[in-house]
Amino acid sequence: MKRVVVLGSTGSIGQQALEVCRLRGYEVVGLAAGKNLEALSRQIALWKPRLVAAEESLHKELKARFPGLRLATAEEVAALEAEVAVAAIPGLAGLAPTRAAVRTGKRVALANKEAMVAAGPLLWREAEAHGAEILPVDSEHSALFQALLGERREDVAELILTASGGPFLREPEDLAQVTPEMALRHPRWRMGPKVTVDSATLFNKGLEVLEAKELFRFPLERIQVLIHPQAYVHGLVRFVDGSLKAQLGPTDMRLFIQYALTYPERAETPLKDLPIPGVLEFLEPDLKRFPALAVAYEAGRRGGLAQVAVSAADEVAVEAFLQGKIPFPRIPEILARVLEATPTEPLTWESLFAVDAWAREEAKRWA
């Protein structure tokens, strides 16, 4: 029986990962969560994990509910003996547990794009040193991974990520009118609040471009974004002979989570079959309407700590927007200001965390 650790178990991806584990009959040996007491309690009761990580404020109540429960840090949960760790703690908070999982040599099903964006070269160095696998959970990167299977790297001309365009592809005309409630209504995907807002600004696609650059170790100038409102095509690879290879599937993250857990095998699912689409639209992204995508590309051109800074600044800006402190168009403005002020230093674990802290404070100044 395959043993799985789920980091970020009470979040959207974490809960869907547990659904996949239930369908596949896997053993969940470790859970790491935040402060959602009731959701975590249900998971502990169902899975009876060996170790659990949660915010310290929950420890007393968890001990009362589950007297024999062993509490630990997220890094200790990540290091448990298991075949796979699902890394789904969002933001830079998920980086240390992801690194801990990589250092134990297990497969890491990576849903935390910020970890790869900020620390891609460092994580790959750790993975190669410890014999770990890193497989993507993001639908677009899973699509590219699948389309690249069996192909020679020198035959690949371009990687193409698709974006639904989010809820504001065409309206309202004035994005200053956008409220948090409007931004949280994504037309296609079931996701957490932060990534849903990022999808609305298209910064999520920018992060995915940077993730693709680091995950596939591919030149930024050969990674393209196309708006695809139907969201049937999740990613395409263009080859040097002009042909294209695409992955299509339903807009259900469980499909991509399962693939990261079962690869190289495929397993049956109870998911609905994709209806054969009548029309597939592909549009160029409007960088004037969605400048956050342009900021992400500029961060990618600078590389290293610039990617760390914009990722950290975005967490602060999105939280400020969700709290009603700033208007929607202010998010990309904050990212651009932080990027311009980012110091140029070599990327190390120490400089990464230092710039992450600096960028958050800098973003708060503008928020």
Curated annotation (Swiss-Prot):
Binding-site list for Mn(2+): 138, 140, 208
Lineage start: Bacteria, Thermotogati, Deinococcota, Deinococci, Thermales
Name of this protein: 1-deoxy-D-xylulose 5-phosphate reductoisomerase
Reaction equations catalysed: 2-C-methyl-D-erythritol 4-phosphate + NADP(+) = 1-deoxy-D-xylulose 5-phosphate + NADPH + H(+)
Enzyme class, UniProt record, top EC level: oxidoreductase
EC annotation from Swiss-Prot or TrEMBL: 1.1.1.267
A GO biological process held by the record: isopentenyl diphosphate biosynthetic process, methylerythritol 4-phosphate pathway involved in terpenoid biosynthetic process
A Pfam entry, by short name: DXP_reductoisom
The encoding gene: dxr
Keyword line: Isoprene biosynthesis, Manganese, Metal-binding, NADP, Oxidoreductase
Keyword Zinc: no
Function: Catalyzes the NADPH-dependent rearrangement and reduction of 1-deoxy-D-xylulose-5-phosphate (DXP) to 2-C-methyl-D-erythritol 4-phosphate (MEP).
Family statement: Belongs to the DXR family.
SS bond list: none
Domain of life per record: Bacteria
Organism name: Thermus thermophilus (strain ATCC BAA-163 / DSM 7039 / HB27)
Residues that coordinate or bind 1-deoxy-D-xylulose 5-phosphate: 113, 139-140, 164, 186, 199, 204-205, 208
Needed co-factor(s): Mg(2+); Mn(2+)
Signal peptide, first to last residue: none
Record: residues binding NADPH: 10-13, 34-36, 112, 114, 192
